[in-house]
């Protein structure tokens, strides 16, 4: 009888083409998502060597990073470098026969929101993209991770990838979340616990009652930030919620093919007794709403907490790093998180730009007004999310409260388009990274859940969403 296997083991084994004595493996890739930033050199490499895209039907190209999210974006992109990248993707997709969603296509959006929406993302698949947040798709029980530009070219040409197998890590979140504590708080708490290097060399499987209780969109938020915990990929075993989400999606199997697929997907569970190289356990009931205070996703604390004192850290290198973070963030040890005032609020990104996120925001801000000191924007993660939000009247709630309602794209998650922070501006953001300069030169980013960001926009400072009325 074969040894018990983890979910990661099963997907890996199903896609293993070849393994060398040194552990180097050739892995078959089921789905390849492409965007404008990491693909131009890859397509040029194909062109120079006279190669074709091996499986264009398994490849999907979407513009997201550089596209403007302002209402006048149909007028074009002002920044020349950004415009060239977007134009190159359109040209390359047409030349190589790859399906392409332009900025004028309502299916366009952030690639990691578009894939699941279209049924392009399915359980048990290997999925890659030249983007580190490809881990998002692991919410479906797919082995998904980012790749570099040379690897993008390799996958386009061969539909395979050279890899070495990672270790298995389990993060189990037991119990149920308290009211107003979300998937975003779970993943920030996990990263705070294990650190940004805690998952290095591993693929993380997320399990436990709290994870199972999450919607598919909540699970995507969890897997999205796996990379911030140091692991290339995160996985959640598929279940009935997964199957229901997939049914009816444009590219999903239909009829008998769907039933056959579901029968296979049900086997994608870790076997009893399977070995994990590392196990981390958290108690969901004890988790508060969380805010980041520094310039790393591991710099997190309860909204009711205070900015920590780096002098309490014994390791000199880490202590110096945290003092630098506080200096960059313009904060002093002992400051209450709820005393920190804000200049900007950004709600969106591949972490929290889905319809459920926007519904939570609407609940918080309906009938209220954004603080006069705050510039707040909401950016739907795709054209379909925008369409759904407007069908539900959410846009009217946002506009009445004083939020800027934008077109879909990556927006202020990263300073690669017109949406960015000015030096010294402080932002509550539902995105995934708070590195120095991530949202703009000398911009200061605090990572929070959508509801926390919404409440902060109204109050002008961080507030405990559990006490919000």
Swiss-Prot record:
Pathway named in the protein's UniProt entry: Amino-acid biosynthesis; L-leucine biosynthesis; L-leucine from 3-methyl-2-oxobutanoate: step 2/4
Pfam family, one: Aconitase
Signal peptide (UniProt feature, chain positions): none
Top-rank taxon, per record: Bacteria
Residues bound to [4Fe-4S] cluster: 350, 410, 413
Enzyme class: lyase
Catalytic reaction(s) noted: (2R,3S)-3-isopropylmalate = (2S)-2-isopropylmalate
Cofactor requirement: [4Fe-4S] cluster
Molecular function GO labels: 3-isopropylmalate dehydratase activity; 4 iron, 4 sulfur cluster binding; metal ion binding
Protein EC: 4.2.1.33
InterPro entries cross-referenced by the UniProt entry: 3-IsopropMal_deHydase_lsu (IPR004430), Acnase/IPM_dHydase_lsu_aba_1/3 (IPR015931), Acoase/IPM_deHydtase_lsu_aba (IPR001030), Aconitase_4Fe-4S_BS (IPR018136), Aconitase_4Fe-4S_dom (IPR036008), IPM_dehydratase_rel_enz (IPR050067), IPMI_cat (IPR033941)
An individual GO BP term: L-leucine biosynthetic process
CDD domains: IPMI
Note on cofactor: Binds 1 [4Fe-4S] cluster per subunit.
Keyword annotations: 4Fe-4S, Amino-acid biosynthesis, Branched-chain amino acid biosynthesis, Iron, Iron-sulfur, Leucine biosynthesis, Lyase, Metal-binding
Protein family according to the UniProt entry: Belongs to the aconitase/IPM isomerase family. LeuC type 1 subfamily.
NCBIfam families documented for this protein: leuC, PRK05478.1, PRK12466.1
PANTHER family: 3-ISOPROPYLMALATE DEHYDRATASE, HOMOACONITASE, MITOCHONDRIAL-RELATED
Subunit: Heterodimer of LeuC and LeuD.
Record function comment: Catalyzes the isomerization between 2-isopropylmalate and 3-isopropylmalate, via the formation of 2-isopropylmaleate.
Entry protein name: 3-isopropylmalate dehydratase large subunit
Lineage: Bacteria, Pseudomonadati, Pseudomonadota, Alphaproteobacteria, Hyphomicrobiales
């Amino acid at each position: 009888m074969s040894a018990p296997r983890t979910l990661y083991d099963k997907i890996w084994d199903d896609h293993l083409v070849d393994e060398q004595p040194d552990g180097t493996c050739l892995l078959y890739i089921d789905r390849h998502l492409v965007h404008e930033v990491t693909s131009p050199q890859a397509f040029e490499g194909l062109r120079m060597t006279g190669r074709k895209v091996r499986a264009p039907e398994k490849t999907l190209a979407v513009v997201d990073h550089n596209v403007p999210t302002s209402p006048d974006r149909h007028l074009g992109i002002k920044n020349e470098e950004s415009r060239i990248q977007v134009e190159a993707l359109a040209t390359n997709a047409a030349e190589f026969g790859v399906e392409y969603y332009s900025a004028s296509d309502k299916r366009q959006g952030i690639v990691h929101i578009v894939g699941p929406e279209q049924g392009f993302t399915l359980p048990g698949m290997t999925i890659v993209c030249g983007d580190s947040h490809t881990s998002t798709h692991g919410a479906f029980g797919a082995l998904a991770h980012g790749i570099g530009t040379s690897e993008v070219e390799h996958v386009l040409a061969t539909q395979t990838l050279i890899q070495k197998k990672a270790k298995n890590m389990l993060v189990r979140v037991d119990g149920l979340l308290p009211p107003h504590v979300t998937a975003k708080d779970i993943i920030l708490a996990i990263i705070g616990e294990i650190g940004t290097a805690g998952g290095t060399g591993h693929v993380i499987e997320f399990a436990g009652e709290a994870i199972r209780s999450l919607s598919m969109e909540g699970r995507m938020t969890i897997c999205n930030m796996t990379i911030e915990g140091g692991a290339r990929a995160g996985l959640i075993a598929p279940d009935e919620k997964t199957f229901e989400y997939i049914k009816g999606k444009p590219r999903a199997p239909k009829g008998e093919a769907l039933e056959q697929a579901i029968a296979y997907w049900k086997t994608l569970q870790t076997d009893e007794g399977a070995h994990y190289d590392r196990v981390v356990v958290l108690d969901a009931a004890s988790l508060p709403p969380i805010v980041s205070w520094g310039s790393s996703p591991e710099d997190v604390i309860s909204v009711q907490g205070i900015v920590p004192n780096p002098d309490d850290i014994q390791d000199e290198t880490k202590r110096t790093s945290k003092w630098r973070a506080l200096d960059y963030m313009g904060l002093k040890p002992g400051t209450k998180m709820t005393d920190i005032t804000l200049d900007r609020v950004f709600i969106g990104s591949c972490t929290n730009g889905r319809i459920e996120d926007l519904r939570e925001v609407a609940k918080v801000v309906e009938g209220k007004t954004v603080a006069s000191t705050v510039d707040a924007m909401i950016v739907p993660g795709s054209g379909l999310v925008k369409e759904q939000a407007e069908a539900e009247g959410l846009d009217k709630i946002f506009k009445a409260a004083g939020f800027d309602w934008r077109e879909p794209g990556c927006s202020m998650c990263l300073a690669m388009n017109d949406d960015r922070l000015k030096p010294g501006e402080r932002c509550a953001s539902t995105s995934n990274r708070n590195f120095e300069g991530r949202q703009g030169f000398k911009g200061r980013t605090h990572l929070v859940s959508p509801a926390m960001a919404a409440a902060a926009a109204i109050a002008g400072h961080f507030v405990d969403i559990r006490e919000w009325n």
